[in-house]
Curated annotation (Swiss-Prot):
It comes from Bacillus pumilus (strain SAFR-032). Homodimer. This is Dihydroxy-acid dehydratase. Signal peptide: none annotated. It catalyses: (2R)-2,3-dihydroxy-3-methylbutanoate = 3-methyl-2-oxobutanoate + H2O; (2R,3R)-2,3-dihydroxy-3-methylpentanoate = (S)-3-methyl-2-oxopentanoate + H2O.
Length: 558
C-alpha cells in the first residue's frame, strides 16, 4: 500500500492543530494510522431516487470501519429532473453536474482523503461524482441507490414516470379521461429509487459497471431489495482493497473502458444523455474521445435489449434476466465488441467479472446471433445542420423508422414549442425545430421530455421528428434528435432554419441536413443578430458564459 495521503493532515508536530480538530470530529488515537475515507453521499428528501440514501451512508460507514478505515460522510446537492421538468428548474439540472463535481473535488482535495465511496443515483449526480473522481484520482468505488420498481395499474400493466408524462398528452388529445390520468399519476412511481426504465439515471449506473468503477450489480439491483444493502457493504469493503493495491479511477477509465461503456449503451439502448456525460467524464480522465468513435462502436455492437420507455420491459426485468454482467457476457461472444482486458474496481478485468454470467431470459436480452437490431441503440448524425454532431436514441424510435423528411416548423424555446403542440400547430410530417435551448442558450440545455411526451401522447410519435440543441430525458422516445452542435446560441446552423425548410433525417446514413440554396443560407447568416443571454445574474449567467456545446460534453472552459 502506498503512503497514506491523509498523513498530510495528521502526521508531525506541526499537525497538532489539525489533529485537535479531527479529535473534535470523533477521531480516536487508534484512528490516526488508518486510511481516511470520504463517503460522498447525495441524500435529499425531495428526490425519490435519493430519499433512502441516508441509510446507505450508515451502511457504507459501518462497512468501512469493519474493514479498517475511518469514514467521513459529506453530502452534495441533487436536482430531480422530473420535478424540474417544464419550468425554470430544468435550466439548473445540467449545470448542477458541474457544482457536484466541483463540490466533491473541493471536499476531497481540502481534506486529503485516501479513498472515496460515492453514493449517487439520479441523472446529474452520478456523472458529477464521476467527473470529480477522475479529477482527484484516489481509489474510488461507486454504489448507486438502485432503480425504482415499475409501477402497475389496476389491470396489471407495468408503467413508469414516462407513462405519466405521455398520459398528459393523451388526456389533452382526448385519448384518456381524467380518472385514467389520475391512475397513472398514482401508480407511476411506486417506490424509492431511480425511475424504473432505461432512462438517464439507470443508464449511467449500468455504464458504471462497464466502465469498471462499480461492482457488478450496481445498475440493476432494486433500491427496495435487501440485496442492495449487501451490495453497499461489499462495495465499501472492496474500496479498502483498492487502497491496498493503489488502483485509481484513471487506471480504470481508459479509452478502452469508455469503448466498453458505449458498447453497453448501444446494447441496452441507453439514454442520449450518456453521450454528454461520458464525454465530460473522459475529458476529466484526460482521454480524448470523439463522436465519430461512438458511431464506430455502434457499427460493431448490436442492440440486444429494448427497454422502457421503448417497450414494457423494465430495469427489474433486466436484472432478472441476468443484469449488466449477462448483457456484457452476451456481447463478448461477438469478436471485437468489448475490450475484456480493462481493469475494474474488483481488481480483476472486465472479462473476469462477466465470465460465466449467461442470460437467463432471451426475451429480455436477445441472443448475440439474433439481436434486436444489428447496430447499436444510439447514433451520431452529422450534416449541414449539425457539423459537430447530433444524437438520436435509435432504440427509442418506434416502428423501425430510419428516415424522415419534411417541412420545418420552428420554435424559439421549449415553452413556445409546447404551446404550439398543444394548439395543434404541429402536424404529421413536420420536423419540429426547438432552438436556443443548448448549454449556452437555454441556459443549461434543458430536457425536452414534455414536448416529446405531448407528441407521442397525441399519436404523432412516428409521424413527427423533433430536432433541438437541447437534450432529451432518458424517458423520451420517438424521432428525437438532440445535442445539435454547434448550438444556435453560438451561431450554429440551427439558428438559420426557417419555417417550411426541407429537413432530412437519415439514421442509416447518419445524416441531418437542410435543403436551402447556398446563397439564401449565407444571406440568413449575415442577417443573424446574434444571441442575447436569457439570464444575466446568478449561477446560470456565469455558466452560460463558460459552457461549451454538447459535442464536448457540455463542460465549462475558462
Amino acid at each position: 500500500m502506498a503512503e497514506l495521503r491523509s498523513n498530510m493532515i495528521k502526521q508531525g508536530i506541526d499537525r497538532a492543530p489539525h489533529r485537535s480538530l479531527l479529535r473534535a470530529a470523533g477521531v480516536k488515537d487508534e484512528d490516526f494510522g488508518k486510511p481516511f475515507i470520504a463517503v460522498c453521499n447525495s441524500y435529499i428528501d425531495i428526490v425519490p431516487g435519493h430519499v433512502h440514501l441516508q441509510e446507505f451512508g450508515k451502511i457504507v460507514k459501518e462497512a468501512i470501519r469493519e474493514a479498517g478505515g475511518v469514514p467521513f460522510e459529506f453530502n452534495t446537492i441533487g436536482v430531480d429532473d422530473g420535478i424540474a421538468m417544464g419550468h425554470i428548474g430544468m435550466r439548473y439540472s445540467l449545470p448542477s453536474r458541474e457544482i457536484i463535481a466541483d463540490s466533491v473535488e473541493t471536499v476531497v482535495s481540502a481534506h486529503w482523503f485516501d479513498g472515496m465511496v460515492c453514493i449517487p443515483n439520479c441523472d446529474k449526480i452520478t456523472p458529477g461524482m464521476m467527473m470529480a473522481a477522475m479529477r482527484v484520482n484516489i481509489p474510488t468505488v461507486f454504489v448507486s441507490g438502485g432503480p425504482m420498481e415499475a409501477g402497475r395499474t389496476s389491470d396489471g400493466r407495468k408503467i413508469s414516470l414516462s407513462s405519466v408524462f405521455e398520459g398528459v398528452g393523451a388526456y389533452q388529445s382526448g385519448k384518456i379521461n381524467e380518472e385514467e390520468l389520475n391512475e397513472l399519476e398514482q401508480f407511476g412511481c411506486p417506490t424509492c429509487g431511480s425511475c424504473s426504465g432505461m432512462f438517464t439515471a439507470n443508464s449511467m449506473n449500468c455504464l458504471a459497471e462497464a466502465l469498471g468503477i462499480a461492482l457488478p450489480g450496481n445498475g440493476t439491483i432494486l433500491a427496495t431489495s435487501p440485496e442492495r444493502r449487501e451490495f453497499a457493504k461489499k462495495s465499501a469493503k472492496q474500496l479498502m482493497e483498492l487502497i491496498k493495491k493503489d488502483i485509481k479511477p484513471r487506471d480504470i477509465v481508459t479509452e478502452k473502458a469508455i469503448d466498453n461503456a458505449f458498447a453497453l449503451d448501444m446494447a441496452l439502448g441507453g439514454s442520449t444523455n450518456t453521450v454528454l456525460h461520458t464525454l465530460a467524464i473522459a475529458n476529466e480522465a484526460g482521454v480524448e474521445y470523439s463522436l465519430e468513435r461512438i458511431n464506430e462502436v455502434a457499427e460493431r455492437v448490436p442492440h440486444l435489449s429494448k427497454l422502457a420507455p421503448a417497450s414494457d420491459v423494465y430495469i427489474e426485468d433486466l436484472h432478472e434476466a441476468g443484469g449488466v454482467t449477462a448483457a456484457l457476457n452476451e456481447l463478448s461472444k461477438k469478436e471485437g465488441a468489448l475490450h475484456l482486458d480493462t481493469m475494474t474496481v474488483t481488481a480483476k478485468t472486465l472479462g473476469e467479472n462477466i465470465a460465466g454470467h449467461e442470460v437467463k431470459d432471451y426475451n429480455v436480452i436477445y441472443p448475440i446471433d439474433k439481436p434486436f437490431t444489428e447496430k447499436g441503440g444510439l447514433a451520431v448524425l452529422f450534416g449541414n445542420l449539425a457539423p459537430d454532431g447530433a444524437i438520436i436514441k435509435t432504440g427509442g424510435v418506434q416502428d423501425g423508422i430510419t428516415r424522415h423528411e419534411g417541412p420545418a416548423i420552428v420554435f424559439e424555446s421549449q415553452e413556445e414549442a409546447l404551446e404550439g403542440i398543444i394548439n395543434r400547430k404541429v402536424e404529421a410530417g413536420h420536423v419540429v425545430i426547438i432552438r436556443y435551448e443548448g448549454p449556452k442558450g437555454g441556459p443549461g440545455m434543458p430536457e425536452m421530455l414534455a414536448p416529446t411526451s405531448q407528441i407521442v401522447g397525441m399519436g404523432l410519435g412516428p409521424k413527427v421528428a423533433l430536432i433541438t440543441d437541447g437534450r432529451f430525458s432518458g424517458a423520451s422516445r420517438g424521432l428525437s434528435i438532440g445535442h445539435v452542435s454547434p448550438e444556435a446560441a453560438e451561431g450554429g446552423p440551427l439558428a438559420f432554419v426557417e419555417n417550411g425548410d426541407h429537413v432530412v433525417v437519415d439514421i442509416e446514413q447518419r445524416i441531418l441536413s437542410v435543403d436551402v440554396p447556398e446563397e439564401e443560407w449565407e444571406k440568413r447568416k449575415a442577417n443573424w443578430k446574434g444571441f442575447e443571454p436569457k439570464v444575466k445574474t446568478g449561477y446560470l449567467a456565469r455558466y452560460s458564459k463558460l459552457v461549451t456545446s454538447a459535442n464536448t460534453g457540455g463542460i465549462m472552459k475558462i
